């Protein structure tokens, strides 16, 4: 990164560098269990923890290494303050629905805190108040309206004008008794508990397909199979759709994080702006000093301007508010957003109650993962759960769901058609080492990346998920799909799903 504030040339997440995670073998044989969990992030691990605690035989598989995806790149705010949602939820779904959503996520905070206390986990758990604020006089009424929603729902709250930190706030809404923590230190302890209780974990084990039945079967890339009573898909975007039409009901949204040594003295609290571009702040302590995690500048994955410019935009916003001494770490992440902003947690489809899913957390995965773990475990045990109807993937709300489905899929179609018609006028000699660009080969769009040795890597830019054309991400050095968020290495290997197969390599010889 060119700016003098950035201490590192490439993105790196603090959570990973500060945690020595265990490693696990790949699956080498067919096996059976009670529950197969696909996905080694916070949702899969927490669900495996809960199920092994309840006495179930669990196998968890991860395509890469555990805690290497979205969870490792979070800002780890443990809160039920999920942006400006409660007035919207009351208007669209009713007071009871909105109250249950809040209760589910507030209970999730207590659930996580209970695990931290039970196992004495050293994960920097600190209770914090969460602040929604605006620096725009024209948006003050929005804060008042959300405050009214908090009042209707009985949320412990406060309305203040001046924040403890100089962000130019005109008005702020406080949600009391939320929290922050170090997510990987917490989840490392859960991994240990899973293994102690007999759970089995396999890394580098890619799920390719699911065979339905009374005892459904996960088929892996190595052709080994896992039979179980239940399968739970926690793989971010579900690799298996099961007739649930998830590609038509979610989109992938990307955002950026700077870990900043600030010029100001940072107080307590977690802060989220409702203005555009929206930014969020919390702190973590590194080597005895507070670093501010300054995040935001979101956009749909694979869409918009050069990805590296988003870091610079975020840096400028931070410089103008908190001041910057240095930026020891920076990274980016993406998450899935459902059309109605409520996660999908429950049966993959109405006809398959033994294949379950958890996805679409809208970047609020710390509490959503705990909601999912308890709800999915109750479904496995055939126990009633008061939040089942809120999160069920088979729900359908006419307003605003239908309009957003139409709008979102029109956007997908636009990018699909645009990519197919595009014929980039870029020559191979125009691509410098470390650069990737779309090119035209034999009349067809392709992707070219030149590595530091000067070698050119060519791939077909057609995403192997549903056929959209991927775009180059100059910050992460990946090919990103603007339709459903799949990401690929310069040489075509899958970095992040829903795609399972790599981009096709092109050989000019």
From Swiss-Prot:
Annotated ranges, domain Rieske: 423-509
Record flagged with keyword Zinc: no
Name of the protein in its database record: Putative Rieske 2Fe-2S iron-sulfur protein YhfW
Cofactor(s) needed: [2Fe-2S] cluster
Membership in a protein family: Belongs to the Rieske iron-sulfur protein family.
Cofactor: record remark: Binds 1 [2Fe-2S] cluster per subunit.
UniProt: [2Fe-2S] cluster binding residues: 463, 465, 481, 484
């Amino acid at each position: 990164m060119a700016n003098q504030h950035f201490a590192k040339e490439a993105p790196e997440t603090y959570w990973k560098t500060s945690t020595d995670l265990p490693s696990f073998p790949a699956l080498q044989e067919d096996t059976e269990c009670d529950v197969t969990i696909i996905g080694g992030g916070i949702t899969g691990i927490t669900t495996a923890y809960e199920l092994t605690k309840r006495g179930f035989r669990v196998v968890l598989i991860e395509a890469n290494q555990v805690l290497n995806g979205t969870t490792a790149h979070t800002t780890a705010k443990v809160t039920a303050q999920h942006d400006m949602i409660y007035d919207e939820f009351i208007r669209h779904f009713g007071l009871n629905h909105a109250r249950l959503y809040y209760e589910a996520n507030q209970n999730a905070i207590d659930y996580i805190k209970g695990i931290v206390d039970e196992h004495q986990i050293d994960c920097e758990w600190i209770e914090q108040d969460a602040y929604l604020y605006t620096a725009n006089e024209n948006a003050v009424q929005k804060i008042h309206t959300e405050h009214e929603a908090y009042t209707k729902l009985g949320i412990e709250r406060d309305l203040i004008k001046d924040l403890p930190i100089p962000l130019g706030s005109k008005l702020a809404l406080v949600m009391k008794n939320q929290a922050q923590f170090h997510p990987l230190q917490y989840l490392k302890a859960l991994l240990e508990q899973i293994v102690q209780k007999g759970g089995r974990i396999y890394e580098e084990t890619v799920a390719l397909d699911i065979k339905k039945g009374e005892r459904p079967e996960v088929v892996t890339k190595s052709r080994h199979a896992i039979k179980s009573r239940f399968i739970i898909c926690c793989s971010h975007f579900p690799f298996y759709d099961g007739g649930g039409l998830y590609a038509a009901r979610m989109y992938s949204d990307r955002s950026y994080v700077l870990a900043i040594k600030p010029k100001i003295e940072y107080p307590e609290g977690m802060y989220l702006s409702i203005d555009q571009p929206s930014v969020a702040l919390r702190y973590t302590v590194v080597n005895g000093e507070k670093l501010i995690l300054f995040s935001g500048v979101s956009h749909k994955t694979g869409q918009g301007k050069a990805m590296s410019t988003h870091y610079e935009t975020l840096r400028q916003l931070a410089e103008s508010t908190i001041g910057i001494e240095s930026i020891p770490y920076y990274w980016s992440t993406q998450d899935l957003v459902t059309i109605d902003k409520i996660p999908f947690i429950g049966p993959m489809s109405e006809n398959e109650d033994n294949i379950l899913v958890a996805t679409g957390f809208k970047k609020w995965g710390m509490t959503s993962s705990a909601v999912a773990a308890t709800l999915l475990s109750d479904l496995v045990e055939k126990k009633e759960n008061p939040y089942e109807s809120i999160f069920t993937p088979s729900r359908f709300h006419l307003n605003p769901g239908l309009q957003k489905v139409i709008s979102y899929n029109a956007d997908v179609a636009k990018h699909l058609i645009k990519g197919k018609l595009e014929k980039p006028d870029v020559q191979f000699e125009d691509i410098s080492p470390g650069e990737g660009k779309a090119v035209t080969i034999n009349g067809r769009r392709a992707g070219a990346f030149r590595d530091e040795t000067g070698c050119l890597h060519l791939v077909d830019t057609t995403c192997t998920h549903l056929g959209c054309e991927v775009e180059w991400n100059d910050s992460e050095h990946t090919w990103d799909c603007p339709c459903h968020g799949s990401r690929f290495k310069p040489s075509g290997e899958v970095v992040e799903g829903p795609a399972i197969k790599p981009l096709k390599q092109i050989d000019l010889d």
